[in-house]
């Protein structure tokens, strides 16, 4: 995943201020899923998507939800349930039958780009660290993510 993340961030960095960006993160799964917790994607207002959060079947709905986050500026958590016939992911054919929880949050200068520049720098310098993401409870606002370099 480190190489995928490094490649994604190197493609994002030159464009970070030309479009609005949303960071999508799989933060929890239940049962089987194509991507595991920690999978990330960056979605731009120009329609570009760097990385995937599913096997492809959820991406269109994730991009639609990302546009709503761009408009509101408020992070959201989305739950896709492949076993629930009433859930959108069931109708989309999620395929795995599991549950995927996704956090979508704005990425901009005001929130220090959610720590993504720090991650990119650490990867380039071969330093280890971790990203602390705040998953908002329903009806609450998320705090910005913070990247912490381990020494």
Where are these regions (language model features)?
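Segments forming oxygen-rich coordination pockets for charged ligands
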Residues: 1-151
